[in-house]
C-alpha cells in the first residue's frame, strides 16, 4: 500500500500598506501643516488690521469732536446750547489734563536735573605727622585735625589722598620748614605736589622752592601750592619735599587737602 503526502502550501506574507495610502498620508500632513501656518499668519494680519481700524476710529472720533467744537464756536443752530456747554466742558477738562501732565513732567525733569547737580560734596584736609624724618613723601596724621567729607576720598597709606569720582578738584598744600644752614652752600628747599594716575604713573603738578635762612634760631618759612586739576577715579595726589628733616610739624604749619568743584 502506497501512502502519498502532499506538501503544505507556504503562508502568504502580509503585504504593507499600498503606495497610494502613503502618498495620501503625506499630502494630508503637508495640508495640515500649511493650514496651521496659514491660520497663524492670518491671525497676525487680522490682529494688526483690527488695531489699525481701532486707531482710525479713534482719529475719526477726535475729528468729529473738534468739528463739533468749531460748530459750537461759530454758533450754528443745529446744536443746542446744552450740548455746546457739555462739549466745551469736556474740551476744557481735556486741555486741563494735558497741561497738568506737562507740568508734572516738567517738575519731574527739573527735580532730576536738580538732583543730578546735588552731587555729594567731596573735600579733605589733613595735617602733617612727624612719624618719618627721612621719607621724601610727607606723611599725614589719620587723627586730630583731619577732615574727609565722604568715602569718595580716602587717605591711603597715610601719604596720599585718593579720589573715587571723576571731576575738577582744587588741590592745595602748605609746607612749613625751618632752616638755619648757610644759604650760600645749600640748594633751595623744594616742595612738589604730585599726581599718581590709576595706571600707576606719576607726574608733578606743581612745584615751589624757597631758599634757606641763615638766622639763628632758624626762621620758619612756608611754601604754598594750589591749583585746579581734573582727576580720574582711582587717581591720588601727594606732597614730596627735598629735605623732610626740615619740615615743621606743629599744628597748622604743614597741611594738605582738596575740594571737588
Curated annotation (Swiss-Prot):
Regions of this protein lying in the Cytoplasmic compartment: 1-22
Keyword annotations of the record: Cell membrane, Cytokine, Disulfide bond, Glycoprotein, Membrane, Secreted, Signal-anchor, Transmembrane, Transmembrane helix
SUBUNIT field: Homotrimer. Interacts with CD28. CD40 ligand, soluble form: Exists as either a monomer or a homotrimer. Forms a ternary complex between CD40 and integrins for CD40-CD40LG signaling.
Topology of the protein relative to the lipid bilayer: Single-pass type II membrane protein
Protein name: CD40 ligand
Transmembrane segments: 23-43
Marked site positions, Cleavage: 112-113
GO BP annotations listed: B cell proliferation; cell surface receptor signaling pathway; immune response; inflammatory response; platelet activation; positive regulation of canonical NF-kappaB signal transduction; positive regulation of extrinsic apoptotic signaling pathway; positive regulation of interleukin-10 production
Record's GO cellular component terms: cell surface; extracellular space; plasma membrane
Highest taxon in the source lineage: Eukaryota
THD domain ranges (all copies): 122-261
UniProt keyword Flavoprotein present: no
Family membership noted in the UniProt record: Belongs to the tumor necrosis factor family.
Post-translational modification: The soluble form derives from the membrane form by proteolytic processing.
Chain positions carrying an annotated carbohydrate: 240
Disulfide bond positions: 178-218
Gene3D superfamilies in the record: 2.60.120.40
This protein's encoding gene: CD40LG
Major subcellular site: membrane
